[in-house]
UniProtKB/Swiss-Prot annotation:
Its cofactor is Zn(2+). GO terms for biological process: methylglyoxal catabolic process to D-lactate via S-lactoyl-glutathione. It comes from Blochmanniella pennsylvanica (strain BPEN). PANTHER family: HYDROXYACYLGLUTATHIONE HYDROLASE, HYDROXYACYLGLUTATHIONE HYDROLASE GLOB. It comes from the Bacteria. Pathway: Secondary metabolite metabolism; methylglyoxal degradation; (R)-lactate from methylglyoxal: step 2/2. GO terms for molecular function: hydroxyacylglutathione hydrolase activity; metal ion binding. This is Hydroxyacylglutathione hydrolase. Zn(2+) 2 binds at D57, H58, D127, H165. Thiolesterase that catalyzes the hydrolysis of S-D-lactoyl-glutathione to form glutathione and D-lactic acid. Its EC number is 3.1.2.6.
């Protein structure tokens, strides 16, 4: 199975998975027009849509796509029940599409019911993990988002992370502001700048890389605590995570 990246809106990515039979799966269609263009160009037959959460920039294309392909099956969390989901799924559920098994992970934080879809080595995590960053957190859900990061942290290191947006340069600039002497982040920023100048994407990323350059995966780091003016002996890493995200919100 192969994957096509479909950039839409200003920063969104829709993901199109397809097989040798020209059957395809669409993940988080924030709009329909460009997806329909891809389907027409490659003569793909849409079999399923996967939704990670209910924000409009991830679901707005569902209804138009269903109009064109009425037999399409839609999988999503409970919060997407009014946006076309036929099967409401959560952690513990798995299913097979195009002969590939997908495992559902609960990843609350960006929204209360946010989920991800894992099909080794791919993770489609919506707006949970971004390269060098994390999604905005709904009020009161910082600890849940931290726990979602922990869940992702323990996936295989070769996991490819497919995020819902292209935010990497902003994220890596923030990471440098927190850890200005970190050589891994400095090197990564230099790489990202080159990619941006060439108008090339930075997603997907890998879990192995994110564990090195993403401060939200490194909340036990004493230099991060120092940068946030937090006690070095603070044990609750989710509190570090929360302060880090607050700092990013005002960056």
């Amino acid at each position: 199975m192969n994957i096509i990246r479909v950039p839409v809106l200003s920063t969104n990515y829709i993901w199109c998975l397809y097989n040798y039979k020209n059957e395809c799966i669409i993940i988080d269609p924030g709009e329909a027009t460009k997806v329909l263009d891809i389907l027409k160009k490659f003569q793909f037959r849409l079999r399923a849509i996967l939704l990670t959460h209910n924000h409009i920039d991830h679901v707005n294309g569902v209804a138009p796509l269903i109009q064109y392909f009425p037999k399409t099956i839609v999988y999503g969390p409970t919060e997407t029940k009014n946006n076309g989901s036929h099967f409401l799924v959560s952690e513990g559920d798995d299913f097979v599409l195009l002969q590939k098994k997908f495992k559902v992970l609960n990843l609350p934080g960006h929204t209360p019911g946010h989920i991800g879809f894992y099909s080794a080595p791919w993770l489609f995590c919506g707006d949970t993990v971004f390269s060098a960053g994390c999604g905005k957190i709904c009020i009161g859900f910082a600890q849940y988002m931290y726990e979602s990061f922990l869940k992702i942290r323990y996936l295989p290191r070769n996991t490819l992370i497919f995020s819902g947006h292209e935010y990497t340069l902003s994220n890596v600039n923030f990471a440098i502001s927190i850890l200005p002497q970190d050589q891994s982040i400095i090197n990564y920023r230099n790489k990202i700048i080159k990619l941006y100048k060439k108008k090339q994407p930075t997603v997907p990323t890998t879990l192995n890389l994110e564990l090195k350059v993403n401060p939200f995966f490194r909340c036990g780091n004493s230099n991060i605590k120092k940068s946030l003016n937090l006690p070095c002996d603070l044990k609750e890493e989710w509190q570090v995570f929360s302060e880090l995200r607050k700092k990013k919100d005002s960056f």
